[in-house]
């Protein structure tokens, strides 16, 4: 697919992804950051994976209901890839080309952690799917929120209340510990892009850590961005 070039004189938006295990606080922190960016007159939107576009939301319902698991790891991975392809080309890239910051709750790292590390899908398969679905699109910053497994699972249980756990929340402690380890390994393999933040702290402390990472790794590097650095 041929991508439209950004309009002349229009700065490309920044692409920030949030990753982490269940109950790590991604949704809370991504919305706090969006509010701060918009208050600073930087247009920002919040989106998510799986989902984020009409077609991808249909697939989200399918995989979180557990149907994807019944098809096997590789078929489930293809479902995630289909959702990502639609999301990238209908939401993420068009927004970035308009100078809008895109804050995404999960992206390709989640596939590498969940389907790669835990589903044993071969790296070569994941690499091939990424070439097709995202091409050269790479986050300007990936925030990995790290929280002890037991605490994350407790938070997830409180969040859903009397509702049933989704396909991934229902997994056992060992699964979630492997997931936490996978994210730490991803961060270690790409330290320029990824920052790990202790999400066991209170909401405001975590938010301050997220902002500091954005300030030091993205805002300072972008001389065109006029925003308070504190």
From Swiss-Prot:
Keyword Nucleotide-binding included in the entry's annotation: yes
Catalysed reactions, semicolon-separated: dTMP + ATP = dTDP + ADP
Gene Ontology MF term list: ATP binding; dTMP kinase activity
Name used for this protein in its record: Thymidylate kinase
Residue positions binding ATP: 20-27
Entry similarity comment: Belongs to the thymidylate kinase family.
Matches recorded under NCBIfam families: DTMP_kinase
The species this protein was found in: Nitrobacter hamburgensis (strain DSM 10229 / NCIMB 13809 / X14)
Residues annotated as signal peptide: none
Record GO cellular component, one term: cytosol
E.C. designation(s): 2.7.4.9
Pfam family, one: Thymidylate_kin
Lineage summary: Bacteria, Pseudomonadati, Pseudomonadota, Alphaproteobacteria, Hyphomicrobiales
GO biological process terms, semicolon-separated: dTDP biosynthetic process; dTTP biosynthetic process; dUDP biosynthetic process
Keywords: ATP-binding, Kinase, Nucleotide biosynthesis, Nucleotide-binding, Transferase
Protein task: Phosphorylation of dTMP to form dTDP in both de novo and salvage pathways of dTTP synthesis.
């Amino acid at each position: 697919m041929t991508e439209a070039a950004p309009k002349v004189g229009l700065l490309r938006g920044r692409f920030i992804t949030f990753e982490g295990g269940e109950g790590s606080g991604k949704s809370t922190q991504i919305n706090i950051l969006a509010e701060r960016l918009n208050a600073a007159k930087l247009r920002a939107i919040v989106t998510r994976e799986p989902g984020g576009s009409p077609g991808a939301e249909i697939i989200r319902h399918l995989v979180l209901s557990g149907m994807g698991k019944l098809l096997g790891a590789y078929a489930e991975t293809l479902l995630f890839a289909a959702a990502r392809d639609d999301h990238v080309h209908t939401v993420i890239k068009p927004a970035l080309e308009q100078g809008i910051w895109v804050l995404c709750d999960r992206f390709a790292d989640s596939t590498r952690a969940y389907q790669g590390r835990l589903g044993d899908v071969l790296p070569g398969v994941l690499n091939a799917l990424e070439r097709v679905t995202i091409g050269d699109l790479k986050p300007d910053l990936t925030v990995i929120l790290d929280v002890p497994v037991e605490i994350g699972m407790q938070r997830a249980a409180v969040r859903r209340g009397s509702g049933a756990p989704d396909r991934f929340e229902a997994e056992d402690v060992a699964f979630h510990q492997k997931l936490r380890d996978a994210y730490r390994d991803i961060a270690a393999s790409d330290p320029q892009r990824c920052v790990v933040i202790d999400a066991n702290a209170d909401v405001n402390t975590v938010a301050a850590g997220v902002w500091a990472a954005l300030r030091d790794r993205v805002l300072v590097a972008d001389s065109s961005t006029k925003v308070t650095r504190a």
